[in-house]
């Protein structure tokens, strides 16, 4: 057995071993709980996106009615050809459709699930996915504003999506 400072070092390592192991176990459990919380928020986001997708068809008639009323108001006494009017209305309707944004939001949410489930280093990938999800949600919100009750419901769901994205981002700050 050694004497002096070497014996003290060995004693410290022997005493610290169990505490270090317990700390590692605690951090692993905490990481699992944070990942589960992130997955729960992502699941809620996916449910909101699915609901937006299911009610977006209801937004089309509301948008058409609003567009028709607005065009009638603007065109009273105007000499615009009906064919030209139909083309412009089709372009405007296409710009207000959120199907592509919903599809991309769902894809990003599935990628987020896979990333969290795989574990390991998430850093920049997680940041990128959350940024893209936020961008798609913002686009959905901007395209569906002002289309009546359907638009209000989509706005509620879009804001819920943004809230879940932010909660996932906050939880990600607790993961190393």
Question: Where are the predicted features?
Answer:
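N-terminal intrinsically disordered, cationic/polar leader segments
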Residues: 1-176
């Amino acid at each position: 057995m050694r004497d002096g400072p070497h014996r003290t070092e060995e004693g410290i390592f022997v005493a610290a071993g169990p505490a270090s192991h317990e700390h590692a176990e605690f951090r692993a459990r905490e990481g699992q709980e944070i990942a589960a919380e992130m997955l729960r928020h992502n699941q809620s986001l996916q449910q909101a996106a699915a609901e937006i997708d299911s009610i977006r068809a209801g937004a089309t008639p509301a948008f058409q009615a609003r567009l028709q009323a607005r065009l009638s108001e603007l065109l009273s006494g105007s000499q615009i050809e009906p064919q030209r009017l139909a083309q412009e209305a089709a372009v405007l309707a296409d710009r207000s459709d959120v199907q592509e944004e919903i599809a991309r939001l769902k894809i990003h949410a599935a990628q987020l699930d896979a990333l969290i489930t795989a574990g390991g280093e998430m850093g920049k990938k997680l940041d990128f996915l959350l940024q893209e999800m936020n961008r798609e949600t913002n686009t959905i919100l901007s395209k569906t504003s002002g289309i009546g009750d359907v638009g209000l419901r989509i706005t509620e769901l879009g804001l819920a999506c943004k809230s879940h994205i932010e909660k996932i981002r906050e939880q990600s700050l607790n993961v190393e």
